[in-house]
Regions:
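C-terminal catalytic histidine-bearing segment of alpha/beta-hydrolase fold enzymes
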Residues: 348-351, 358-402
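N-terminal pre-domain segments of enzymes
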Residues: 31-76
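Cap/lid segment of the alpha/beta-hydrolase catalytic domain
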Residues: 143-227
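Bacterial N-terminal signal peptides
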Residues: 15-27
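Short beta-strand element of the alpha/beta-hydrolase
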Residues: 134-144
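Primarily recognizes the serine-hydrolase "nucleophile elbow" in alpha/beta-hydrolase
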Residues: 234-289
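N-terminal cap/lid segment of alpha/beta-hydrolase-fold proteins
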Residues: 85-131
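The feature captures the conserved acid-bearing segment of alpha/beta-hydrolase catalytic domains
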Residues: 280-366
Length: 402
């Protein structure tokens, strides 16, 4: 009898354990975005009003309009950064924490100055120790709004894998993030510096508050975010003998940067913006996706609700997000793969991308030059570049595999 009771209690305990596990799993599922139908308001959404070109010529005119809105004199493809060549490997214990120093043959520190504002950003141009067929190629990496300290969230393993495969790697940070500490600009005619007393998202919001009209011409503020990348590409093309293609991998705000720089600089052949943006009309339907000033700036990204259904469907700014996406993949031999984490813990999650992905892919394909596609990563629940994306998307695409 005692054995029966003991056995009964053991069985009851196992049953309760299973029951509690199932309840816990149900609770987890309840708070996760579900792979079900789109929200009712988004079903049958037509994104075509957010694209204002249907020929290559019209698309290139839109690209030129965007470039001239930011740089009135055109893209600064001849401007070089100042350079400290072959710096000490101690940088891997400081600004390049998370990267494997044993994979680097040389590191040059680049200082990009945005003129005439005396605003500076650092970048690190890393030459690989191993020489392969990739050693004429460059990949730019950006971590977005990362914390100070070592690179992480998959950016570190991406950099190390690329160096191991023989690529040159350009490590970059956004303004007022990571190793970029310059917090002042000198405006033309001003008697004193304009200061930003915050970093990260708050600092970026200050930049837009203090550097938009009437202080500077509209669009000029984006130079502080994008021009360093252009100078980095300029340096690569000047320095590396028989320089090859340039690619861009960015996470979060770095994904935002990847969309933007690929739209204006066609020298970026392949871009992988990871968890970087959604069109404005989708942000209310994806938790945490509102974004900071550079994500939402109305003169650029404005969308209007022309039919009164509460969901914008018409582009009204300089370039809509969908136009920027398309321009990032348009051009001979060019491609953009937008990576969105389905269960992202930060932003740009769920399946709302389905409202535009087929339309945009077909548009770029039908225009006849370039490619645009999307990859929904369901392998994790974090805000990161996953091992799956690195091994199944980035490396195969860079290797010419489909």
């Amino acid at each position: 009898m005692e054995n029966l009771v003991r056995g009964g209690r053991s069985s009851l305990g196992r049953c309760l354990a299973i029951l509690f596990a199932l309840v816990g799993q149900l609770q987890t599922w309840a708070v996760m975005p579900q792979e079900e139908n789109l929200p009712a308001a988004l079903q049958n959404y037509d994104p075509s009003g957010l694209i204002r070109f249907n020929t290559l010529d019209q698309a290139e005119k839109k690209r030129e309009q965007l470039i001239r809105w930011i740089w009135s004199g055109g893209l600064p493809v001849d401007v070089q950064p100042t350079v400290d060549r072959d710096i000490d490997t101690a940088v891997f214990e400081e600004h390049l924490g998370g990267l494997d120093a044993q994979l680097a043959g040389r590191v040059d520190r680049l200082n990009a100055s945005v003129s005439p504002y005396d605003y500076h950003q650092l970048m690190y141009f890393i030459s690989p120790k191993v020489r392969t067929t990739n050693s004429r190629r460059l990949v730019i990496l950006n971590s977005g709004h990362r914390a100070n300290g070592a690179f992480q969230y998959g950016v570190d393993q991406t950099a190390n894998r690329l160096l191991r495969d023989g690529f040159h790697v350009l490590m970059t940070d956004m303004p007022l993030v990571g190793f970029n500490s310059d917090n002042s600009v000198i405006l033309p005619g001003a008697n004193e510096e304009t200061l930003f007393d915050a970093r990260g998202t708050s600092g970026h919001n200050q930049m837009f508050a203090k550097l938009c009209p009437p202080m500077l011409p509209d669009g000029e503020v984006f130079r502080f975010f994008l021009e360093p990348f252009i100078q980095g590409v300029n340096y690569f093309r000047k320095t590396v003998s028989d320089a090859g293609d340039v690619s861009f991998v960015g996470l979060s705000g770095g994904g935002w940067a990847g969309h933007m720089i690929a739209a204006v600089d066609v020298r970026i052949q392949t871009s992988f913006p990871v968890a970087g943006s959604l069109p404005l009309y989708l942000r209310p339907y994806s938790p945490g996706s509102r974004g900071d000033a550079e994500q939402m700036y109305e003169p650029l990204f404005k969308e209007v609700d022309g039919d009164g259904d509460g969901i914008p469907e018409t582009a009204a700014g300089v370039a809509s997000w969908l136009e920027i996406y398309a321009l990032g993949g348009l051009g001979p031999g060019r491609k953009q793969v937008q990576v969105l984490n389905f269960y992202d813990s930060c932003c740009f999650s769920t399946n709302v991308y389905l409202t535009y992905t087929a339309f945009l892919s077909e548009l770029v394909r039908d225009l006849g030059e370039g490619e645009w596609t999307i990859y929904s990563d369901r392998s994790h629940r974090a805000h990161m570049i996953s091992t799956q994306v690195l091994s199944e998307v980035i490396i195969p695409q860079l290797s010419g595999q489909k």
